[in-house]
């Protein structure tokens, strides 16, 4: 039976990590997978996380199963982070949150819930987007369509093309938006553009699904939620798949959340019971450790202050690396203008490098980036910047 199975293609991002590990060149540089690295090239455990873990080590009394939807305090903290403390939506009990195995788990839970319990057949994602979006929705039996997003020539959001292509989306279609730090372009709508999209989506009858993996990495925790909150103010129904991998550095703990919003508390309770049924048939209930860490930090003023400062430090380091990257490329004699990179948000930059140039970077210089030309700015350090920029200039 198994001998007739053909091998799956390597994952475009995680497969790159395998190649990087196997590369024995000492000066190799990994700008592929989206993890934060500090000035020394390490992915650190945050101080706030260590302190929360110490607290849990001393105070945890059981390893019993969690409920299907996870830790209640985690859900409460997640909703406040997304919609703001004192949000009308929270006060009216219109939101329910399930703790999930990472942001990917949240997307799959949302996809399974929609496929089984609604008339949704199509999900619209931006072109380009995170490659795994298509796999997740297709695996749940949903069709994936693309809407225009990026103006490659001007390195900007092509908002007119975005609106035009979404004119094809029908009432009852799901439209997926990146909450902030669009992956892979790093280009986000302005608040005014978010409000236009929110208004349009109400008029057209789309169900908004927000993929929110980078809250705090663009401008700040509150500022980065502006787009989502513009939608929440106008929409009776929406779904948010959020992740704590990046902003808490909890990559391998798989801490995510799927938040369902409906018109009233009775409707959301009914719908959420079906979301829990989808979870029960998938992984039964979530693991406790990472979510306990997040809930401990977010509900403790002292720990939260440490975490917010650490998040600010990470965001500012990435912004410094963007500036240094652009300056160093110029110093090394790049024959094109890369200043657009400074305006992008989050970990990634859509560099404009071609597949061929990316391949040459890897084979000739040991510099690893995704074939689309997406580079992880958080993988850059003052030490690797000069060789990196020399390699890029050599392949231009």
From Swiss-Prot:
UniProt keyword annotation of Transferase present: yes
Residues binding L-aspartate, per UniProt: 34, 130, 183, 374
Induction annotation: Transcription is increased specifically in response to 2,4,6-trinitrotoluene (TNT) and its indicator compounds 1,3-DNB, 2,4-DNT, and 2,6-DNT.
EC number, as in UniProt: 2.6.1.1
Gene Ontology molecular function terms on file: identical protein binding; L-aspartate:2-oxoglutarate aminotransferase activity; L-tyrosine-2-oxoglutarate transaminase activity; protein homodimerization activity; pyridoxal phosphate binding
Positions carrying N6-(pyridoxal phosphate)lysine: 246
Catalytic activity field: L-aspartate + 2-oxoglutarate = oxaloacetate + L-glutamate
Effect on the protein upon substituting residue 374 to A: Reduces first-order rate constant about 10000-fold
GO biological processes: L-phenylalanine biosynthetic process; L-phenylalanine biosynthetic process from chorismate via phenylpyruvate
GO cellular component: cytoplasm; cytosol
Gene3D superfamilies: Aspartate Aminotransferase, domain 1, Type I PLP-dependent aspartate aminotransferase-like (Major domain)
Chief localization: cytoplasm
Applied use: Has been used to construct a 2,4,6-trinitrotoluene (TNT) biosensor strain.
Keyword Cytoplasm: yes
Cofactor: pyridoxal 5'-phosphate
Subcellular location(s) of the protein: Cytoplasm
Keywords: Aminotransferase, Cytoplasm, Pyridoxal phosphate, Transferase
Family according to the record: Belongs to the class-I pyridoxal-phosphate-dependent aminotransferase family.
Subunit structure, interactors included: Homodimer.
The protein's name in its UniProt record: Aspartate aminotransferase
Source species: Escherichia coli (strain K12)
Gene label: aspC
């Amino acid at each position: 039976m198994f001998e007739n199975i053909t091998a799956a293609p390597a994952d475009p991002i995680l497969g790159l990590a395998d190649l990087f590990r196997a590369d024995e060149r000492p000066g190799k540089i990994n700008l592929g997978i989206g993890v934060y690295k500090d000035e020394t090239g390490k992915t650190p455990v945050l101080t706030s996380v260590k302190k929360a873990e110490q607290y849990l080590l001393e105070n945890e009394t059981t390893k019993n199963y969690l409920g299907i939807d996870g830790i209640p305090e985690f859900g409460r903290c997640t909703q406040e982070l997304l919609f703001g403390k004192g949000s009308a939506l929270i006060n009216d009990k219109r939101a329910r949150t399930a703790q999930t195995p990472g942001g990917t788990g949240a997307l799959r839970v949302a996809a399974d819930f929609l496929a089984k319990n609604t008339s949704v057949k199509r999900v619209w994602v931006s072109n380009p987007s995170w490659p795994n979006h298509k796999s997740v929705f297709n695996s749940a039996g949903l069709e994936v369509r693309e809407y225009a997003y990026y103006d490659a020539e001007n390195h900007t959001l092509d908002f007119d093309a975005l609106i035009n292509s979404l004119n094809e989306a029908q009432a009852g279609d799901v439209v997926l938006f990146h909450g902030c730090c669009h992956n892979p372009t790093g280009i986000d709508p302005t608040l005014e553009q978010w409000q236009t999209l929110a208004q349009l989506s109400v008029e057209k009858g789309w169900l908004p699904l927000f993929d929110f993996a980078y809250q705090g990495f663009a401008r700040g925790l509150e500022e980065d939620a502006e787009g989502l909150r513009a939608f929440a103010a106008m929409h009776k129904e929406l779904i948010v798949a959020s992740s704590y991998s990046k902003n808490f550095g909890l990559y391998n703990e798989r801490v995510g959340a799927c938040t369902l919003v409906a018109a009233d508390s009775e409707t959301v309770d009914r719908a959420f019971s079906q979301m829990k049924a989808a979870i029960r048939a998938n992984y039964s209930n979530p693991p406790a450790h990472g979510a306990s860490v997040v809930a401990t930090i977010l509900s403790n003023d002292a720990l939260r202050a440490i975490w917010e400062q650490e998040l600010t430090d990470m965001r500012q380091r990435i912004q410094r690396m963007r500036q240094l990257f652009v300056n160093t490329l110029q110093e090394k004699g790049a024959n094109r203008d890369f200043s657009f990179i400074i305006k992008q948000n989050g970990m990634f930059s859509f560099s404009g490098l071609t597949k061929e140039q990316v391949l040459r970077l890897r084979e000739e210089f040991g510099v690893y980036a995704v074939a689309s030309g997406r580079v992880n700015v958080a993988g850059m350090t003052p030490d690797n910047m000069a060789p990196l920029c020399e390699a890029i200039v050599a392949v231009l």
